[in-house]
Regions:
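Basic, nucleic-acid-interacting segments
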Residues: 1-198
Length: 198
């Protein structure tokens, strides 16, 4: 469904998410820990920005072809090895940020690199995944999310560990950001590109 960031919500519903066994017959420890909090999740939705998929009331729609093509374009620009088949995987997430209890992720490519200040920075993996719901507040036994960005396609680029001073790390982030903007296929603006440093 077409995501539009909205501040007005005409629909509200609640859920309790529980840890369940995976296809391998095991329960994810992080999911089990989260389920011990016994939170009731309250979701706010606007029909302009979310549909029954985001409410987990109908099956997921087909993969967004434009998002897949953008992930392939970025993978090529980073000289990554693109897989001949892309499969949808499910990551268990029961903190309430996803109504289904899992996030859909696709491993698109591995390897590759970018040049920064004359040094080669390796790429570990490139994934296409979906964004989570936006946390509004967490109080007592309730957690509140808006669904206006749930399911928005994201390209996740994991780089090799980097050694260097903070300026070099900043230069890597700037170089990667510029590469993404050159595609003219990614959202621009504050908060549209998120970069985590671990």
């Amino acid at each position: 469904c077409t995501p539009i960031e909205e501040d007005e919500f005409s629909r509200k519903f609640s859920r309790r998410l529980r840890a369940a066994k995976s296809e391998l017959g095991k329960i994810d420890p992080a999911a089990l820990f989260e389920s011990t909090k016994s939170k009731t999740i309250v979701y706010y939705a606007n029909p302009k920005s979310s549909c029954l998929v985001e409410e987990d009331e109908e099956p997921p729609h087909a993969l967004d072809i434009d998002a897949k093509n953008i992930a392939l374009l970025i993978s090529s620009a980073l000289k990554s090895t693109i897989f001949s088949e892309i499969h949808v995987m499910r990551k268990t997430v029961i903190d309430g940020s996803n109504t289904t209890g899992f996030q859909r992720t696709m491993l698109v490519a591995q390897g590759g690199h970018i040049q920064v200040d004359g040094k080669e920075v390796g790429v570990q993996s490139i994934c296409l995944e979906e964004d989570a719901g936006k946390l509004i507040k967490d109080e007592g036994n309730h957690r509140f999310f808006s669904l206006d960005r749930l399911g928005v396609p994201l390209v996740e680029i994991a780089l090799d560990p980097v050694e260097g001073d903070p300026k070099f790390v900043k230069d890597i982030a700037l170089t990667l950001g510029r590469l993404l903007r050159v595609t003219k296929k990614v959202m621009r603006g504050i908060g549209s590109i998120r970069q985590d440093v671990n």
